[in-house]
Amino acid sequence: MGLKLWVKQRRSLPFIIGTIAIALFTDLFLYGIITPILPFSLVDRVGISPDRVQSVISTLLAVYAVANIAASSPIGFLADKFLTRKVPMLIGLIFLTSATALLTFGNSVPMLIVARVLQGLSAAVVWTVGLALLVDVVGADNVGSTMGGIFGFISLGEIIAPVFGGIVYESLGYYASFGVCFIILLLDIALRFLMIEPREMKNDSTLQDVERTSILQRQDTQDHELKPKRSGLFSSLCLPIYSLLHHKQIFGPFWTSFVNSCLFSAFDATIPLELKTLFDFNSLQCGLMFGVLSTPYFFCGAWAGAMVDRRGSRTIGKRAYAILGCTLFLLCIPRTNTSLNIYLFSAFLAINGVVLAFTSSPGFVQSSHYVAEYELEHPTFFGHNGPYTQLFSAYNIVYSLGMIIGPLVAGFLRDQFNFITSIACLSLLCFSASLMANSCFTDRLDSE
């Protein structure tokens, strides 16, 4: 009885959602812990000259994204070949553990690059397969509030990681900063092994009935649809979801995701150096400022996602991006090293954090609803495993492109011109996302 109860808990919706949330949290934590440390460790530990730090940081951010892009389509293809989504999730842990070890003990730029490549491979797995599993278990109608809540929770990784990294680096040194990483990894490993996803419940009679019904429904329409046969290699590189890129309900969310990625990665590349230059901050203070940016995300994420579920994506998306395009310029006001300007910069970061919380859910909700409706009309189009792995695989590629372009462009503009020029470029991207949301997204009333 006790064993059956434990199995029941392991396959429960809260346990699965919690496992996915911890996996995403771990990915962000291990990605973010080094953000406030790099400007200092590259000089003190690796021996990089100060004038090369910006370019090396941008490179490390970019190679992470390149690895993510290279892996996303093959992972999206291969993940659907496994009987469960759990297997690729476990494979991702191998990449993540190896990356963490290299970041901990690596003392050269090539070793750090390899570590970031492995992190990119791990992220491609967890963000593609994990989010697909999430939509599998909660359904498209609840994806906004669920993702909003998860994004709010995993923003703790973005909050805690830089702060923790800065505190421990300042007080105990480089190696101690990564000790907690392995503890979190152990928790992540345990949860991924313990989780029982719906696909593993093959012996459950109810599930068999559902599968039998689903197969019959698909077979009824299969004869009416002709799909080109693809070789395995071609399928892995050209998933069916890509043929929908000309649909505005897909292209629009992809563009807003690209903009979000540019914003976050540009912040990672420029804000620590701007704080160091403008206010003479150390790694701890830089980490605390990232906490100021991310904390509003934690408190507003679920609320913003629930609003999108209830009202739709267009109004919230277009307004959030338009407001963000304006509030970014607040960061340009403090230009001298005074206590007042430090407080102002903190307040302006918090304001932008609140607005950012309202930009994450609209695109995900819009595209998830659209592919769900498209699959109802074309049941065999995405294959027997449905659209979500493919959708989030494509999202990974788009987001990773932003992670390449964002830090490189923002870092270049800051080096060649100034921080204000970088912010102006990011603001233009936000306004373009607002226009895209207005023309490509829909509200609930529009679809009724």
Swiss-Prot record:
It is found in: Endoplasmic reticulum; Membrane. Its main location: endoplasmic reticulum. Pfam families: MFS_1. Keywords: Endoplasmic reticulum, Membrane, Transmembrane, Transmembrane helix, Transport. The chain crosses the membrane at residues 14-34, 59-79, 87-107, 120-140, 148-168, 171-191, 250-270, 288-308, 316-333, 338-358, 392-412, 417-437. Gene3D superfamilies: MFS general substrate transporter like domains (1.20.1250.20). GO terms for molecular function: transmembrane transporter activity. Belongs to the major facilitator superfamily. TCR/Tet family. The keyword Membrane applies. GO terms for cellular component: endoplasmic reticulum; membrane. It is a multi-pass membrane protein. CDD domains: MFS_MdtG_SLC18_like. InterPro entries: MFS (IPR011701), MFS_dom (IPR020846), MFS_trans_sf (IPR036259), MFS_Vesicular_Transporter (IPR050930). This is Uncharacterized MFS-type transporter C18.02.
